[in-house]
């Protein structure tokens, strides 16, 4: 039991927009919970009423249209998390099954990493502030991770409680029923200290691929967030330039430069004619230019709405984005009845996380290699169209290599 079931915004590890799903055992399918609708779902940290020295993690979902809480599920060590498709994940804990339909694979990957972080903290018992901030910075998947913000209520609480005696903690955060604990001798700490949180949402993070193969349900996804990239994170187009100063008149200064005969200087740059004794150059020497090392202009760069990677518009062609919709690939999966093989392997030969081997994999070291190919041969007897998949898939790969097939990057905004 916890006293506070509505966590603050800065207690969230990750927050995304998704549709909350519930399992219908009668039909064996998933249905939208309580009429459906887009909800804001996140993994947050809460502190139980009994200060046991560690905090719990709660998956909290609130529907956007009416602000109704439709999902509250505690993260336990025995939680079984399944990534069924790139945009649909579900989990089971305490005989309770919940699911989320995300708007994009990027949101799904971010939520998956948030759940993994919560499970790691529960397993290892590492709930210190330093590890929390470090892990959140490493988890950063664009703009779905929340950052802590100071408010007037926080400042007023700091004034009321100027000094706290914390027996087993490094510091006490000024929020009711929430503190981050670490086993240390009792000391006195003031609440006037400020802790900075440095998050780099556009820093390259470790990409965790959900599945190396395609699901038969894949028909393309769209990211409805359209998060614009701040200008301060956009790299300059030409990083080889030194300093560019645009002024009408040359700057007057007291320095003089000895005249060195060079074709770069003309008689217009000299204060006196060449035969008039010592000459003094009144202008600064020209900037040194590295010839042959200036790279080609990169052109305009944007962030892809599907894979969230930066791409160049001039070099964007088909086959560059693996997460983008590919009508030809989807058509091949449907015409060749490959979706039947995926469905059979998912329901019969998948692990607890819902992953299974590639249907066309020839890795003999796999545990169920013979069983998988026997099942595929039996399925091919019922659906002969499966024999058309290898040549069609080979032609599609050639088309991707030539730039004729495959998905293209799409800029946000």
Swiss-Prot record:
Top-level taxon of origin: Eukaryota
Domain SPR: 303-411
Membrane topology: Peripheral membrane protein
GO cellular component, one term: plasma membrane
Cross-referenced PROSITE patterns: KBD, SPR, WH1
Region (Disordered): 122-163
SMART domains associated with the record: WH1 (SM00461)
Keyword S-adenosyl-L-methionine: no
GO molecular function, one term: protein kinase binding
Disulfide topology: none
Predominant place of localization: membrane
KBD domain: residues covered: 195-248
Pfam families (alphabetical): Sprouty, WH1
Residue span, WH1 domain: 5-122
Full protein name: Sprouty-related, EVH1 domain-containing protein 2
UniProt organism field: Danio rerio (Zebrafish)
Lineage, highest ranks first: Eukaryota, Metazoa, Chordata, Craniata, Vertebrata
Gene designation: spred2
